[in-house]
Amino acid sequence: MKHFAYESAQSVEQASELLRKGDAVLSAGGTDLTGVLKEKLLPNYPRTVVSLKEIPGMNRIAEEADGLHLGAMAILADIASSSVVRSKWPALANAAYSVATPNLRNTATVGGNICQDVRCWYYRYPDSIGGRVNCARKDGHLCYAMMGENRYHSIFGAMKVCQTPCSHGCPANTDIPAY
């Protein structure tokens, strides 16, 4: 992993200002970003990693008059174990519980999971092992996720749709139609 500066933002405004300076990335729980940095998957390696962990209220899980409010820094394990979420939004509690391993759930955040980089194994294949894969997302010409082994691939962010995505395999048995 290359060297980078680490800034712990104390407010959303401070995090935004650090991002505006350029060559910076945000870190929520950091579970995905750490691997991305180690494998040098970003087109431009950041000079600064901006942590959001110290921003007050970002980890909020609260029932309000208009519904459930989840902060971007809400940890998945906290959502899964929240008594209010489990009693009033059991599908959400079940979905949060079904993500990854317990160790990852104890660190991973809602915002980080929404914003994480592409999880395709062709895209993430390290250039240092057996040469670079000619991946379309890495300025190549082919999408191996469409043509190769793809049964465990995400349905979100696809360039094309080959078949109806999922119904029973998605968290909380959500039925997401083809788009």
Language-model segment annotations:
Residues 1-171, 177-178:
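C-terminal structural segment of proteins
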